[in-house]
Each structure stands twice: as structure tokens, then as C-alpha cells.
């Protein structure tokens, strides 16, 4: 199952995990003037959106208006962009990469974590990435949780 970023953030928020304030829109008439500065993120099921010009930063909503219209009129990798996530811009102290992938052959969930998050997880050296398997019937054990959260790069 693939989730859009806004769907993932809704799940995190439901479990009281802080996420930036934001909202989704599918039409420019839904653009609000309550966030300055802001981040505009096209919601497509692909990685590398920033490098592909699908994540942009603006000082105010007026500045973001035309680019949002352009994004909503784009097709990306054969799929029309239908939804935009608009979020408050926050100062980033640290950036991490965390991914959960279902390994159907093993019947387990693969957790991939790196303290070098951000744009190019594919280009991070292997020794900077922590990989653990999670048995869905056991859950996130303390061992795995400690391994991932205390992971330090060499």
C-alpha cells in the first residue's frame, strides 16, 4: 500500500506525533492566507519530489497562487496532479529517513532508517542506513525500537 504524504501525516497526527500545520487543496479557491512562509507539495506517489520541482517554498500565499495553479494543471509520470499539500514552513533541526516496506516473501515488515534523511536516500552510503525486520504479529519490540532510535552513524 502506498500513501500520499498527507495521508501519512494524518496517521501520525492521530497518534499525537507532531506534524507541521497544513491542509490539502484540489482547487485554487481553497488556498488560505493564514500561513507565511509556506511549503507547497504536489501529492504524487513517487519519491524525489523536491528534485522534480514538485515541492516549492514561498514567502506567502499570494506568491504561491500561480505555481499551485500550474501544479494542478500538470501530469506527472502519467498521473494528473489532483491534490496539493500546503504546510507551514518550519525550521528543520534534523532530517531523518524512515520507511516501512512489506516483504511479502518473508511475511515481515522491513524498517529502513537513516539519520541522513532528506532528498537522496538512494545515494546514502550503506553503512549510514539501519535495516531491521519487524514481525507484524510481534509488533515493534523494544530491541528494534532501541536499535533504530539509537542508531549512530560511524
Regions found by a protein language model. Give the residues of each.
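General structural feature for long, well-ordered alpha-helical segments within catalytic domains
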Residues: 4-11, 63-67, 140-144
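A conserved helix-loop-beta module that forms one wall/lid of the active-site cleft
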Residues: 1-37, 42, 150
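Hydrophobic alpha-helical hairpins/lids featuring a short glycine-rich hinge
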Residues: 78-136
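Catalytic core of tubulin tyrosine ligase-like
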Residues: 15, 64-66, 70-77
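Short beta-strand-to-loop capping motifs
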Residues: 26, 57-60, 88, 100-102
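ATP-grasp fold ATP-binding core
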Residues: 6-12, 35-50, 77-92, 98
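Glycine-rich phosphate-binding loop of ATP-grasp-fold ATP-dependent ligases
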Residues: 20-22, 40-67, 97, 119-126
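A long amphipathic alpha-helix within ATP-dependent nucleotide-binding catalytic cores
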Residues: 141-154
Amino acid at each position: 500500500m502506498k500513501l500520499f504524504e498527507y495521508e501519512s501525516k494524518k496517521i501520525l497526527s492521530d497518534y499525537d506525533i507532531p506534524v507541521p500545520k497544513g491542509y490539502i487543496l484540489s482547487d485554487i479557491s481553497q488556498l488560505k492566507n493564514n500561513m507565511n512562509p509556506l511549503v507547497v507539495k504536489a501529492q504524487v506517489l513517487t519519491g524525489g519530489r523536491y528534485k522534480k520541482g514538485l515541492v516549492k517554498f514561498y514567502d506567502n500565499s499570494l506568491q504561491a497562487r500561480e505555481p499551485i495553479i500550474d501544479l494542478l494543471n500538470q501530469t506527472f509520470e502519467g498521473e494528473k496532479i489532483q491534490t496539493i499539500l500546503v504546510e507551514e514552513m518550519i525550521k528543520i533541526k534534523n532530517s531523518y529517513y524512515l520507511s516501512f516496506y512489506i516483504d511479502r516473501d518473508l511475511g515481515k515488515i522491513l524498517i529502513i532508517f537513516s539519520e541522513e534523511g532528506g532528498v537522496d536516500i538512494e545515494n546514502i552510503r550503506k553503512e549510514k542506513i539501519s535495516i531491521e525486520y519487524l514481525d507484524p504479529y510481534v509488533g515493534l519490540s523494544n530491541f528494534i525500537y532501541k536499535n533504530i532510535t539509537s542508531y549512530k552513524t560511524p
